[in-house]
């Protein structure tokens, strides 16, 4: 019981709400900060609440609506999430509806809403703009207990999952000035939280935050091997008959991993945005009902999963930001039992993520997302406590060691030179890369091809003419992973750029030298002037992980 709740235990309202909590939900006690949020909403106050996954966000808007006996409107981004909530409420004997693109007879549902048939009205952000008049009438005729905006981080341009549709729902204060707004999220930094308050015009700019710590989650990071089966199958075998989610970066990778698991006689479902709604619904339902234990998915299988006994979450590929990663591992251990989160990465993953980011033409978006990606890179490469890195990212103070992550438990203590970061001067190698690319005109090669050339690979894709290139084999003393890091840093610093070219059915990613890169090499050739060149084209020492 937190201090706020302790100060209210003798009030009549507190006793009524505790009785409601027990009668409807079967719980004896509120979770941290729950009562404070509920009480403020009942008082008509706006609230921005940041509660970790499994902290009971739904009760924060359900209990006020039941207590006030007025309908609540909930903005939710996923149809699957709405349906999950509707089914849960149905089991509790509480009426609710989901107004979204799947509804065939919207006119009838609007009529039912105005006849007060539903206590909870779930609406997608895309659909709510068409319900303005109905919402105003509902407030005039019966009153609305609150407007709840779930996954509120989607409204902030500073957040990891900004969605344009959420920007269209900022009208509530104009049409319902006296109805409290409850903005809810499990993943928001202080900057994002304040932006949520500003955009929604809340009468508060200070969020109510509970701890982000999920002490029952074990955190471990590993580098990918050349064979995904060697990485994933042993983990699945370590936790037999347990519910497992495996996240992949792309739809193609999702299918590939699912096929590999099938070959190894591992039964799994697959879920990504390219599949039919029928297929996705079946996978989702079968997983929730334990008909399948393992799902391989993209992040499309994220917010809509309300399964308490997920025991393992595997990220096969570096996530693009810490907020998304935190939300996805939050699918694990919602029952409070110990659960295990593994992340596999290589530096090609970061190049893939940069490519995704570059496909958005908004420079502010690119800048924000690239900064978030760098934070994720630090998480997977640093040797300090993983939990400490996560919690400090969310502006939460914590102890130096959690004793429940790979770094604290000494998992890597016998591994030489893996994931040890150091600042390295790679000017000569950077110059080698740029000169190699410039020496092969009219060629559209990706990072891996240039690395193969530098390392003197015997790959058949390297033509005899290129094998005669003076740079062929000059980088053989360094590993492919090491070279990938150098390429990644050169792209990050603007000396190279990754360009998408459509040469056939599918686009390919090729590497080009930028004007900044050409200028830098020209100056680097002057040798003695290298340390005195203009800072705008200076190559900084880079933080490297791979040592050879």
UniProtKB/Swiss-Prot annotation:
Keywords: ATP-binding, Helicase, Hydrolase, Nucleotide-binding. ATP binds at residues 51-58. It catalyses: ATP + H2O = ADP + phosphate + H(+). A motif (DEAH box) lies at residues 150-153. Its EC number is 3.6.4.13. InterPro entries: DEAD/DEAH_box_helicase_dom, DNA_helicase_ATP-dep_RecQ, Helicase_ATP-bd, Helicase_C-like, P-loop_NTPase, RecQ_Zn-bd, RQC_domain, WH-like_DNA-bd_sf. It comes from the Viruses. Disulfide bonds: none annotated. One of its GO terms (molecular function) is nucleic acid binding. GO terms for biological process: DNA replication; double-strand break repair via homologous recombination. Residues 38-206 form the Helicase ATP-binding domain. PANTHER family: BIFUNCTIONAL 3'-5' EXONUCLEASE_ATP-DEPENDENT HELICASE WRN, DNA HELICASE RECQ FAMILY MEMBER. NCBIfam families: recQ_fam (TIGR00614). This is Putative ATP-dependent RNA helicase R290. It comes from Acanthamoeba polyphaga mimivirus. The lineage of its organism: Viruses, Varidnaviria, Bamfordvirae, Nucleocytoviricota, Megaviricetes.
């Amino acid at each position: 019981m937190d201090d706020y709740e302790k100060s209210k235990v003798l009030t009549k309202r507190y006793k009524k709400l505790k009785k409601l909590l027990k009668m409807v939900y079967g719980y004896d006690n509120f979770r941290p900060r729950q009562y404070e949020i509920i009480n403020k909403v009942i008082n008509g106050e706006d609230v921005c609440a940041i509660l970790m996954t499994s902290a009971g966000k739904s009760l924060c808007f359900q209990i006020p609506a039941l207590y006030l006996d007025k309908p609540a409107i909930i903005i939710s981004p996923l149809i699957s999430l709405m349906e999950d909530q509707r089914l849960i409420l149905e089991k509790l004997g509480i009426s609710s509806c989901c107004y979204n693109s799947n509804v065939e007879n919207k006119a009838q549902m609007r009529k039912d809403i105005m006849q007060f048939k539903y206590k909870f009205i779930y609406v997608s952000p895309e659909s709510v703009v068409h319900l303005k008049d109905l919402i105003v009438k509902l407030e005039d005729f019966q009153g609305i207990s609150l407007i709840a905006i779930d996954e509120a981080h989607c409204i902030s341009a500073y957040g990891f999952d900004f969605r344009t549709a959420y920007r269209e729902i900022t009208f509530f204060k104009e049409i319902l000035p006296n109805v409290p707004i409850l903005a809810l999220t499990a993943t928001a930094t202080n900057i994002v939280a304040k932006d949520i308050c500003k955009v929604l015009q809340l009468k508060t700019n200070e969020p109510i935050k509970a701890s982000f710590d999920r002490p029952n989650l074990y955190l471990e990071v590993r580098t990918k091997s050349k064979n995904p089966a060697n990485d994933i199958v042993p983990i699945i075998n370590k936790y037999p008959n347990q519910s497992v989610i495996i996240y992949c970066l792309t739809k193609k990778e999702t299918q590939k991993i699912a096929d590999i698991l099938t070959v190894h006689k591992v039964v799994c479902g697959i879920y990504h945005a390219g599949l039919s709604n029928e297929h996705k619904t079946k996978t989702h339902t079968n997983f929730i009902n334990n008909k399948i234990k393992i799902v391989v998915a993209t992040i499309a299988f994220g917010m809509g999963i309300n399964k308490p006994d997920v025991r393992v979450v595997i990220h096969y590929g570096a996530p693009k930001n810490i907020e998304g990663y935190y939300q996805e591992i939050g699918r694990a251990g919602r029952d409070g039992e110990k659960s295990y989160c593994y992340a596999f990465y290589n530096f090609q993953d970061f190049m893939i993520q940069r490519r995704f980011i570059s496909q958005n033409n908004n420079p502010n978006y690119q800048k924000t997302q690239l900064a978030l990606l760098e934070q994720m890179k630090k998480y997977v490469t640093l040797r300090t406590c993983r939990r400490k890195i996560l919690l400090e990212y969310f502006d939460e103070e914590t102890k130096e060691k959690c004793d429940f992550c790979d770094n604290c438990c000494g998992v890597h203590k016998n591994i030489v030179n893996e994931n040890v970061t150091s600042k390295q001067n790679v000017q000569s190698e950077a110059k080698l890369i740029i000169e190699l690319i410039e020496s092969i005109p009219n060629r559209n090669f990706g990072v891996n091809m240039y690395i193969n050339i530098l390392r003197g690979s015997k790959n058949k894709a390297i033509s005899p003419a290129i094998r005669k290139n003076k740079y062929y084999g000059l980088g053989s003393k360094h590993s492919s992973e090491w070279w990938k890091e150098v390429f990644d840093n050169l792209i990050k610093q603007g000396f190279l750029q990754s360009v998408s070219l459509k040469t056939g059915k599918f686009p390919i990613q090729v590497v080009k030298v930028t004007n900044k890169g050409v200028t830098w090499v020209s100056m680097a050739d002057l040798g003695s002037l290298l340390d005195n060149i203009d800072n705008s084209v200076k190559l900084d020492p880079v933080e490297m992980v791979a040592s050879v």
